[in-house]
Amino acid sequence: MERECEKSVVVAVVTEPRFTQRYRDYLEKQKLLDRQYRVEKLRDGTVALPVLAETLSEHHLQELKNRVAPGSTCKLTQLLDPLPSKKARVCSPAQRLCLEVRRWVEDRGVTWSTELEADLPRSWQRHGDLMLLSEDCFQATQWKRLEPELWETVASALGVQRLAKRGRVLPDGTRTPTVTLLLGDHGWVEHVDNGIRYKFDVTQCMFSFGNITEKLRVASLSCAGEVLVDLYAGIGYFTLPFLVHAGAAFVHACEWNPHAVVALRKNLEINGVADRCQIHFGDNRKLKLSNTADRVNLGLIPSSEEGWPIACQVLRKDVGGILHIHQNVESFSGKNPQPPGSSNMEKKHWPHPQKITTDKQGNRTTGSCMGEMSSASKPEWQRWAESAESQIASLLHQVHGKPWRTRILHVHPVKSYAPHVDHIVLDLECRPCPLVG
């Protein structure tokens, strides 16, 4: 889970106040409660308990809802800038870093200044014994004269053995990170999410911390006997939950970043599912696969639209299937939803998971996919979903030469960005129309 000393975003379990103590007792016993942050009361009167997302699983959520506190509403949310606990306020990681670096710098005869203090890391991600620093730190010229010993001091203050510093993601289609290794001899790290092991090289591959709720949702799906095509597999963010927890019979994983493919192969092996997955290396728009998938995952943002034609191509011709379409949607009032052109955005608080569903009369309504919801889905989400549904129906007709019917099952928020941009997932059911006559 991402740890930041400023503008932190943490996952929290939300329930009613009367169930808070039972939830707290269970989470503490399971070592899931994040003691760095305080339990918070939300605007709608519910209570959010910060948790360690890297060890939280769908099983724990079901335990809370069905055994620990029957009748409770158990939902996930994310908290922006959560309040630190009393214990954490004694000396925060940021304060400890500042104190130790300042002491070390002054011992070497360098005058400490407000410029140097402002140039310390504002955020970081912990990857086991490696800390990945934000790109906007250690830019002052004075630091250069203190390398490489400086990095040993920083690592010691943060309690790690290795250090790296991230830069901007390259606009090369493969989302290659520009990460510099400052201390250590390699960038390979391991994460465990929901019982799934992910290994990757932070200098070559991205890891999507903010997608934990979507990975948990995917893991809870019932995909027994199904064939899935994951058009943007990466290191296995969604391929692995579909295989390990959702029970997919087989996955075709498409990826064109060679470094991500190396990590994906490792992750399939260490999770014991390599025999149920075929990797298709290269541009998925040239994929020869067709008439195969019961389900297609299109996990690319800001838009997966370039993959829509191939998604239609790989669906089974006899019964069709379900598309999981990721998209960033702008939510400006009075504007048609458009995918944003930049991913250089700052995370904000995001709402609880929701859905748009279609009733028997064809009227679309909003509701909950994980218990009752406290806020309505945004109209821009619904307008984009309807537009995507129409385009997919047209593509299906073109690809298969006959009409198909489509139906919006759910629209789920994953996370929100500033300004006014939401990462959402549309679950779209696609079925061939029965022959008449």
UniProtKB/Swiss-Prot annotation:
Region ranges (Disordered) = 331-374
Name the CDD domains for this protein. Answer: AdoMet_MTases
Disulphide bridges in this chain?
none
What's its catalytic activity? 4-demethylwyosine(37) in tRNA(Phe) + S-adenosyl-L-methionine = 4-demethyl-7-[(3S)-3-amino-3-carboxypropyl]wyosine(37) in tRNA(Phe) + S-methyl-5'-thioadenosine + H(+)
What Gene Ontology molecular function terms does this protein carry? Answer: tRNA 4-demethylwyosine alpha-amino-alpha-carboxypropyltransferase activity; tRNA methyltransferase activity
Could you tell me the Gene Ontology terms of the biological process aspect for this record?
tRNA methylation; wybutosine biosynthetic process
Q: Which residues bind S-adenosyl-L-methionine?
A: 208, 215, 255, 283-284
EC numbers, comma separated = 2.5.1.114
The record's keywords, sorted A to Z, are: S-adenosyl-L-methionine, Transferase, tRNA processing
Specify whether tRNA processing is a keyword of the entry: yes
Q: Where is the composition biased (Polar residues)?
A: 331-344
Give the record's GO CC terms: cytoplasm
The biological pathway it contributes to is: tRNA modification; wybutosine-tRNA(Phe) biosynthesis
**Uppermost EC category:** transferase
Determine the domain of life of the protein's source: Eukaryota
Query: Which InterPro entries has this protein been placed in?
Result: MeTrfase_TRM5/TYW2 (IPR030382), SAM-dependent_MTases_sf (IPR029063), TRM5-TYW2-like_MTfase (IPR056743), TRM5/TYW2-like_N (IPR056744), TYW2_N (IPR056745)
Family, as annotated: Belongs to the class I-like SAM-binding methyltransferase superfamily. TRM5/TYW2 family.
PANTHER family referenced in this protein's UniProt entry, alphabetically: TRNA METHYLTRANSFERASE, TRNA WYBUTOSINE-SYNTHESIZING PROTEIN 2 HOMOLOG
Function (record text): S-adenosyl-L-methionine-dependent transferase that acts as a component of the wybutosine biosynthesis pathway. Wybutosine is a hyper modified guanosine with a tricyclic base found at the 3'-position adjacent to the anticodon of eukaryotic phenylalanine tRNA.
Q: What is this protein called?
A: tRNA wybutosine-synthesizing protein 2 homolog
Q: Native species of this protein?
A: Rattus norvegicus
Q: Which gene encodes it?
A: Trmt12
